[in-house]
């Protein structure tokens, strides 16, 4: 991944201890997995909004939260609806979407919010090591360089062959 989000002054957003991640499927699933796996190390509260559970959404304090809205197309209906429910003119928002004419980009510009370009060659379910997963990881207080090292490890042919062999052995043992 490239740190396309580093051009945004992230320091001003690190003060938030409550962060809403709004998106669907792969746009937030990788970040949700990172948060679930490393929750004991993370001192912030992350809320993953990917459906229309209005009771949960309505109970969130809109003033003291950072909203991170993620949609590759920028036109995902559920993401748009949830964003409109959770945002207000004074809320702090960061949008990650393709650099194309889309609803969320228009909304971000109208609200004078930060916009980070979602790389158009990365699909949602494969995006955890891109800005879609690494910006939330950074806001969680995690060292994104360690993820970059993991990315290099995954590209290593011998590591992958060993991993596949071990997974196969584990599956065989579980039968």
Residue ranges and their predicted role:
Residues 16-159:
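Glycine-rich phosphate-binding loops that contact phosphosugars or nucleotide phosphates
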Residues 1-3, 9, 144-148, 156-175:
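Acidic catalytic cores of enzymes that act on phosphate-bearing nucleotides/polynucleotides
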Residues 1-19, 29-30:
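Low-complexity, highly charged intrinsically disordered N-terminal segments
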Residues 9-11, 55-59, 173:
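Short, flexible, glycine/charge-rich loop motifs used to bind or transfer phosphoryl groups or to couple energy/partner
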């Amino acid at each position: 991944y490239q740190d396309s989000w580093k051009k945004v002054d992230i320091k001003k957003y690190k003060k938030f201890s409550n962060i809403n991640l709004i998106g669907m499927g792969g746009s937030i699933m990788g970040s949700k997995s990172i948060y679930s796996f490393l929750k004991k190390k993370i001192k912030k509260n992350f809320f993953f909004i990917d459906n229309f559970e209005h009771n949960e959404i309505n109970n969130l304090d809109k003033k003291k939260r950072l909203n991170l809205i993620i949609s590759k197309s920028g036109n995902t209906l559920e993401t748009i609806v949830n964003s409109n429910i959770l945002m207000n003119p004074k809320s702090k928002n960061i949008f990650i979407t393709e650099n194309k004419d889309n609803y969320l980009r228009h909304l971000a510009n109208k609200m004078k919010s930060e916009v980070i370009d979602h790389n158009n060659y990365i699909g949602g379910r494969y995006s955890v090591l891109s800005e879609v997963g690494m910006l939330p990881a950074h806001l969680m207080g995690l060292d994104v360089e360690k993820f970059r090292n993991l990315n290099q490890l995954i590209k290593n042919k011998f590591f992958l062959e060993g991993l596949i062999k071990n997974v196969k052995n584990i599956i065989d043992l579980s039968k």
